[in-house]
Amino acid sequence: MKKRMLVIAAAVAATTMMMTSPVMAEDFKVGICNYVDDASLNQIVDNVQSRLEELGKEKGVTFDVSYDNCNADASVMEQIISDFQADKVDLMVGVATPVAMRMQSATEGSDTPVVFSAVSDPVGSGLVDSLDAPGANVTGTSDHLDT
Protein backbone atom coordinates (compact mmCIF):
# COMPACT_ATOMS: atom_id res chain seq x y z
CA MET A 1 0.00 0.00 0.00
CA LYS A 2 2.77 2.46 0.93
CA LYS A 3 4.65 1.69 -2.27
CA ARG A 4 1.54 2.25 -4.34
CA MET A 5 0.95 5.61 -2.63
CA LEU A 6 4.52 6.72 -3.39
CA VAL A 7 4.17 5.72 -7.01
CA ILE A 8 0.89 7.63 -7.16
CA ALA A 9 2.52 10.69 -5.57
CA ALA A 10 5.42 10.55 -8.04
CA ALA A 11 3.03 10.12 -10.95
CA VAL A 12 0.92 13.07 -9.79
CA ALA A 13 4.01 15.24 -9.38
CA ALA A 14 5.35 14.21 -12.77
CA THR A 15 2.01 14.79 -14.48
CA THR A 16 1.61 18.16 -12.78
CA MET A 17 5.13 19.05 -13.83
CA MET A 18 4.29 18.22 -17.45
CA MET A 19 0.96 20.06 -17.42
CA THR A 20 2.30 23.26 -15.86
CA SER A 21 5.16 23.68 -18.32
CA PRO A 22 4.42 26.59 -20.67
CA VAL A 23 5.72 24.53 -23.58
CA MET A 24 5.42 20.77 -23.41
CA ALA A 25 8.96 19.60 -22.86
CA GLU A 26 10.04 16.19 -24.03
CA ASP A 27 12.65 15.65 -21.34
CA PHE A 28 12.40 16.08 -17.60
CA LYS A 29 15.27 15.76 -15.16
CA VAL A 30 14.51 13.89 -11.94
CA GLY A 31 16.94 13.66 -9.03
CA ILE A 32 16.44 10.79 -6.58
CA CYS A 33 18.46 10.56 -3.38
CA ASN A 34 18.25 7.56 -1.08
CA TYR A 35 19.40 7.89 2.53
CA VAL A 36 20.93 4.41 3.00
CA ASP A 37 21.25 1.12 1.18
CA ASP A 38 18.25 -0.77 2.57
CA ALA A 39 16.00 -3.30 0.84
CA SER A 40 12.75 -1.43 1.53
CA LEU A 41 14.19 1.97 0.61
CA ASN A 42 15.79 0.54 -2.53
CA GLN A 43 12.39 -0.91 -3.49
CA ILE A 44 10.89 2.58 -3.27
CA VAL A 45 13.56 3.89 -5.64
CA ASP A 46 12.99 1.00 -8.05
CA ASN A 47 9.23 1.57 -8.01
CA VAL A 48 9.55 5.30 -8.67
CA GLN A 49 11.96 4.70 -11.54
CA SER A 50 9.70 2.01 -13.04
CA ARG A 51 6.63 4.21 -12.81
CA LEU A 52 8.42 7.18 -14.35
CA GLU A 53 9.50 4.94 -17.23
CA GLU A 54 5.90 3.76 -17.72
CA LEU A 55 4.56 7.30 -17.48
CA GLY A 56 7.17 8.51 -19.96
CA LYS A 57 6.09 5.95 -22.54
CA GLU A 58 2.45 6.73 -21.91
CA LYS A 59 2.91 10.51 -22.25
CA GLY A 60 5.64 10.46 -24.90
CA VAL A 61 8.24 12.14 -22.70
CA THR A 62 11.59 11.14 -21.26
CA PHE A 63 12.53 11.23 -17.60
CA ASP A 64 16.29 11.59 -17.23
CA VAL A 65 16.76 10.15 -13.74
CA SER A 66 19.85 10.86 -11.65
CA TYR A 67 20.06 8.51 -8.68
CA ASP A 68 22.44 8.59 -5.75
CA ASN A 69 22.72 7.28 -2.22
CA CYS A 70 24.26 9.45 0.50
CA ASN A 71 24.83 6.50 2.87
CA ALA A 72 23.64 8.57 5.85
CA ASP A 73 26.47 11.06 5.34
CA ALA A 74 25.20 14.65 5.67
CA SER A 75 28.02 16.17 3.62
CA VAL A 76 27.48 13.67 0.80
CA MET A 77 23.72 14.36 0.93
CA GLU A 78 24.42 18.08 0.69
CA GLN A 79 26.63 17.54 -2.37
CA ILE A 80 24.07 15.31 -4.09
CA ILE A 81 21.29 17.88 -3.60
CA SER A 82 23.59 20.70 -4.72
CA ASP A 83 24.37 18.69 -7.85
CA PHE A 84 20.64 18.24 -8.50
CA GLN A 85 20.17 22.00 -8.21
CA ALA A 86 23.13 22.71 -10.48
CA ASP A 87 21.66 20.28 -13.01
CA LYS A 88 18.34 22.15 -12.72
CA VAL A 89 16.30 19.01 -12.08
CA ASP A 90 12.56 19.37 -12.60
CA LEU A 91 11.69 17.12 -9.66
CA MET A 92 13.52 15.89 -6.55
CA VAL A 93 12.61 12.64 -4.80
CA GLY A 94 13.87 12.18 -1.25
CA VAL A 95 13.80 8.72 0.31
CA ALA A 96 13.78 9.00 4.13
CA THR A 97 13.22 11.96 6.44
CA PRO A 98 16.72 13.52 6.48
CA VAL A 99 16.92 13.65 2.68
CA ALA A 100 13.39 15.00 2.32
CA MET A 101 14.01 17.71 4.91
CA ARG A 102 17.21 18.84 3.21
CA MET A 103 15.52 18.87 -0.20
CA GLN A 104 12.70 20.94 1.25
CA SER A 105 15.17 23.45 2.62
CA ALA A 106 17.19 23.54 -0.60
CA THR A 107 14.13 24.20 -2.78
CA GLU A 108 12.44 26.74 -0.52
CA GLY A 109 11.34 29.69 -2.62
CA SER A 110 11.75 27.78 -5.88
CA ASP A 111 9.30 25.99 -8.13
CA THR A 112 11.12 22.65 -7.90
CA PRO A 113 8.71 20.05 -6.50
CA VAL A 114 9.88 17.53 -3.91
CA VAL A 115 8.28 14.11 -3.46
CA PHE A 116 9.25 12.17 -0.34
CA SER A 117 8.79 8.63 0.91
CA ALA A 118 9.74 6.62 4.00
CA VAL A 119 8.95 9.58 6.26
CA SER A 120 7.25 8.57 9.50
CA ASP A 121 5.94 11.98 10.53
CA PRO A 122 5.76 14.45 7.64
CA VAL A 123 3.75 16.98 9.69
CA GLY A 124 5.91 16.72 12.83
CA SER A 125 9.11 17.01 10.81
CA GLY A 126 7.78 20.18 9.17
CA LEU A 127 7.74 18.77 5.65
CA VAL A 128 4.02 19.41 5.13
CA ASP A 129 1.33 21.52 6.76
CA SER A 130 -1.05 18.57 6.93
CA LEU A 131 -1.51 15.18 5.32
CA ASP A 132 -4.62 16.41 3.48
CA ALA A 133 -3.13 19.68 2.22
CA PRO A 134 0.67 19.53 2.16
CA GLY A 135 1.21 23.12 0.99
CA ALA A 136 4.31 24.56 -0.68
CA ASN A 137 6.24 22.39 -3.14
CA VAL A 138 6.53 19.21 -1.03
CA THR A 139 4.34 16.10 -0.98
CA GLY A 140 4.77 12.39 -0.52
CA THR A 141 3.92 9.33 1.50
CA SER A 142 4.38 8.37 5.12
CA ASP A 143 5.54 5.01 6.39
CA HIS A 144 3.83 5.55 9.74
CA LEU A 145 1.93 2.51 10.97
CA ASP A 146 -1.07 3.40 13.08
CA THR A 147 -1.23 0.33 15.30
Protein language model annotation of sequence segments:
Residues M1-K2, T20:
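Generic cytosolic/nucleocytoplasmic N-terminal low-complexity/intrinsically disordered segments
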Residues K2, A13-A14:
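Terminal low-complexity, poorly structured segments
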Residues K2-I8, A25-T147:
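Short hydrophobic alpha-helices and adjacent helix-cap/hinge residues
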Residues A11-A13, V23:
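Cleavable N-terminal signal peptides
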Residues T15-M17, M103:
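Residues in and immediately flanking transmembrane alpha helices
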Residues M19-A25:
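Sec/Tat signal peptide C-region and signal peptidase I cleavage site
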